[in-house]
Design a protein with these regions (language model features):
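Positively charged, low-complexity terminal tracts
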Residues: 1-60
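Short, compact, well-ordered microdomains
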Residues: 52-81
Length: 81
């Protein structure tokens, strides 16, 4: 199944429909080299959650992926996270 890790965060302002406004940045992330690699190597489909961001009174989108230990090591070495 792999380990669930946070792979990307997107901060947004106070918008009326955060799911709608998050769509474009999520698609940009999925098209990046990091996003493509994670899509190919995640053991389950990546998922995201939208939460209130109390620091900015806006929203935070958090994207998760499931990686095996070997893939997680590669990910951390390649992207330094």
């Amino acid at each position: 199944m792999g380990l669930k890790i946070t792979v990307h965060k997107i901060a947004m302002g106070d918008v009326e429909d955060p799911e709608l406004y998050a769509a474009a940045p999520i698609m940009e992330f999925e098209k990046s080299a990091k996003g493509r690699w994670l899509t190919e190597n995640s053991k389950q489909q990546m998922e995201y959650i939208v939460r209130p961001n109390p620091e900015t009174y806006g929203w935070m989108v958090i994207i998760f992926a499931w990686l095996e230990e070997q893939d997680l090591t590669y990910y951390r070495l390649k992207w330094g996270e």
